[in-house]
Amino acid sequence: MVDITAIFLAAGRGVRMGERGRMTPKGLLSIGPASFVEDAVATLRAHGLSSIRIVTGHLADHYKTLARERLPDAELRHNPDFADKGSLHSLLVGLKGEAGPCLLLESDLVFEPRAVEAVIADPARASLLVSGPTGAGDEVYVWADDRAGKACLKDMSKDAARWPTPHHGELVGLTYLTADAVTRLNTIGPGMVAQDPMSDYESGIVALAGTEPVICPKIDDLAWAEVDNETMLARAAELVYPRIAAARKTHPLMGT
């Protein structure tokens, strides 16, 4: 298996979480017995991904405690500019000096094991995971073009009417980068941040897709959720997490 480094983007301030976000980084919120990041790490390790890197910013000391007490082999990289620059800058902090392939994850996600399998299924190609409709609110829609029988990334937007053609699905928040893709992002990313310091990582992936194909595997019925506010947290706890827990129990790599 290709040695893949998992990079969590965990620097954000969690403003929309209100008081909860001011007290705790979103990646360290929990629904089940472990935090979102710890849940994700367990799933990654079950799939053979043991190299974990977390890009911190807001409430970084909480991640230092996590690494010291429960994830001692995780590498922490601090983004001191988390309040003034967007997630593309955090991604570049995570990718600095990296020569191998990486799996990029948003830290405020819960997801079932199939997500990891799908996004790293073809290690020779960069890949952005897509789901069917969730109705979760705040969706990011993905448009794709057909290239040699593969749906490949064209654009992303929260505006479902951005393109006249139907979107391919919804962004999940797991993106696999080949070694070549890492090199290209490290080349084009700094200029994008210089032009717009608040650039998000999604814009970097769209720019990457203009230089090489980024395939968009889709799982229509994937159990997953992003948690940006209290309403999304309640939805994830009531409707999504029970499906994820059930999927883990029956999964051949994670079942007990």
Task: For each feature predicted by the language model, list its residue ranges.
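Short beta-strand-to-loop acidic/aromatic patch adjacent to the donor-nucleotide binding site
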Residues: 100-110
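Short beta-strand/turn micro-motifs composed of small residues
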Residues: 10, 56, 106, 130-131
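Left-handed beta-helix
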Residues: 1-2, 147-149, 180-183, 187-256
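Conserved core of the sugar-phosphate nucleotidyltransferase
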Residues: 112-192
